[in-house]
Structures are given as structure tokens and as C-alpha cells.
Curated annotation (Swiss-Prot):
Protein's recorded name: Phosphatidylglycerol--prolipoprotein diacylglyceryl transferase
Protein function: Catalyzes the transfer of the diacylglyceryl group from phosphatidylglycerol to the sulfhydryl group of the N-terminal cysteine of a prolipoprotein, the first step in the formation of mature lipoproteins.
EC number of the protein: 2.5.1.145
GO biological process terms, semicolon-separated: lipoprotein biosynthetic process
Pathway membership, UniProt: Protein modification; lipoprotein biosynthesis (diacylglyceryl transfer)
Membrane topology according to the record: Multi-pass membrane protein
Subcellular location(s) of the protein: Cell inner membrane
Sorted UniProt keywords: Cell inner membrane, Cell membrane, Membrane, Transferase, Transmembrane, Transmembrane helix
Length: 281
């Protein structure tokens, strides 16, 4: 027995030609949470620089991660399309953001603040890191409401979900495995892993508490950032085994996804940062 995707309207409300969408709303509440939690952490840790500059820092990182996320998606996932449809670069409401690109954008912003205010970049990233998982989880809920980024076909998984708008992608699976046609006829679409919910739990909830409890004690500079890179990379690589690869890319060499390739350097960087932070002389 499979689970049917609930009928969720991705639009909250519409006023004239303008529609407010849940996906965009998730970005708003993520930023508001980061602002609230960041100020709370800055007061608790008595970091005066953060108290005075936290709003500018978070506004800048939010903007940098959004721009980086968009550029990253274009470069990593769909460059051929956007190179021929330049105006579509600005159609953010159509989707198309990359976490890895957003991370690069955030690092660039933090590097600027590090230079301007004579702070170590890892001091800034250790402060920012606990604010990230909430946004990741909220983003995946937005993806779920949009019924996008669903997982791979899994007819033997009892808790697989039927996503009605996966039908076009289902045709490719049925072409490879004609026996799946019966399932499609019976349920209207093929059963798939609800990987948005997997990512919500692992990258949003679990990663938040890992970072939260780890950062409650004083830690060597960089260790919080390193821990985040390691666990996010591991969680993302794991989930990619269940997530449907982007159709324009598919599996690279029929083995690995782009998300896994981009996550591997995160784990390596995290291990190096953790080692240097915890075992430096």
C-alpha cells in the first residue's frame, strides 16, 4: 500500500498578477529564524562584534547564498539550457537553486567580512553554521509542497509515495522497465521515495540538533564549521542514492550524481578543518 501525495496548493494567496508561494515563504521564515537565533547566540556568547554587525552580516549572507545558489544551479546542473535562455536566469520562481552554489556564495561574503573586520573566517562560519539547518529543512518542505525533487521509483517500498506530476519522468522508467506500466495504470503514477522528507529530517532536524548540542560547549575555532561540512556531505551523499537524478544530467558514468560529486569535497574539507582545529599545536 503506497502513500498518495496530499493535495497541497503551492500558492498561499494571489493578489492580481502576483502570487505568494510557500516555497518563497520558506526562504522568508528561514531568514527570520536566522536573524532571531543569530541575535540570541550573539548575546549568549557575548560577541560584541556580532551584536553590532549581525543584521548586515546575515542580510549579506542571505543575498550571497541566493545569488550563489542560482548561479551554482545554472553552472552545475543546467548550463546548456540557461546559456540559450538567458532571461530564464532571473525566473527564480520557476525553481532551480543549488545548496553547494549557495555555500560558495556565503563563503565569498564571509571572506569579505573576515577581511573588513579583521576576523578569522572560521570564527564567522562557526557563528553562522548553527543557523543553516533550519533553512535547509524549511526549503525541503517547500520542495515537498511544490511536489518536486522526489525520489527514485521504488515499487517494493511500502511507504513510497505517489507524486502525480512525476508522470513525464515515469514514462522514461516504464520505457526501461515495461512491467511498471501496470503500477502506473493502477495508481496514476509510479511510487517513489519522498526524499524531500528524508532531507527535511536528516539535513533539517537531525543536523540542527547535532550542531546545537556540539556548539553548546566552547569548541576550537573551526570545529563547528568542520562538523557541519562532514555531516551535511554524508547525509546528502546518502540521500542521493534515493533521490531522482536531475533529468538533464542523470547519473554521471551511470554511477554517481552531481550532488554526490559536489558533497564529497565538503566531507574532505570538513575533516581537514576538524583536524587542524582540534589537533593544531
Amino acid at each position: 500500500m503506497y502513500i498518495f501525495f496530499p493535495k497541497l496548493n503551492p500558492i498561499i494567496f494571489t493578489i492580481g498578477p502576483v502570487s505568494a508561494r510557500w516555497y518563497g515563504f520558506m526562504y522568508v521564515i528561514s531568514f527570520l529564524f536566522a536573524m532571531w537565533y543569530g541575535k540570541k547566540c550573539s548575546i549568549k556568547n557575548k560577541k560584541i562584534w556580532y551584536e553590532k554587525k549581525i543584521e548586515t552580516l546575515l542580510y549579506s549572507i542571505f543575498l550571497g547564498s541566493c545569488i550563489g545558489g542560482r548561479i551554482g544551479y545554472i553552472i552545475f546542473y543546467n548550463f546548456s539550457y540557461y546559456s540559450q535562455n538567458m532571461l530564464s536566469v532571473f525566473y527564480i520562481w520557476e525553481g532551480g537553486m543549488s545548496f553547494h552554489g549557495g555555500l560558495i556564495g556565503a563563503i565569498i561574503v564571509m571572506s569579505y567580512f573576515s577581511f573588513k573586520y579583521k576576523k578569522k573566517i572560521l570564527e564567522i562560519s562557526d557563528f553562522i553554521t548553527p543557523l543553516i539547518p533550519f533553512g535547509l529543512g524549511a526549503g525541503r518542505i517547500g520542495n515537498f509542497i511544490n511536489s518536486e525533487l522526489w525520489g527514485r521509483v521504488s515499487p517494493n517500498f511500502s511507504y513510497a509515495m505517489i507524486f502525480p506530476n512525476s508522470q513525464n519522468q515515469d514514462l522514461k522508467e516504464i520505457k526501461k522497465y515495461p512491467e511498471l506500466q501496470l503500477l502506473s495504470d493502477q495508481y496514476g503514477a509510479l511510487p517513489r521515495h519522498p526524499t524531500q522528507l528524508y532531507e527535511f529530517f536528516l539535513e533539517g532536524i537531525l543536523l540542527f540538533f547535532i550542531i546545537y548540542f556540539f556548539s553548546k560547549k566552547d569548541r576550537p575555532t573551526g570545529s563547528i564549521s568542520g562538523l557541519f561540512l562532514i555531516f551535511y556531505g554524508l547525509f546528502r551523499i546518502f540521500i542521493e542514492f534515493f533521490r531522482e537524478p536531475d533529468p538533464q544530467i542523470g547519473l554521471l558514468k551511470n554511477i554517481i550524481t552531481m550532488g554526490q560529486i559536489l558533497s564529497l569535497p565538503m566531507i574532505i574539507a570538513g575533516l581537514i578543518i576538524m583536524y587542524k582545529s582540534c589537533y593544531k599545536k
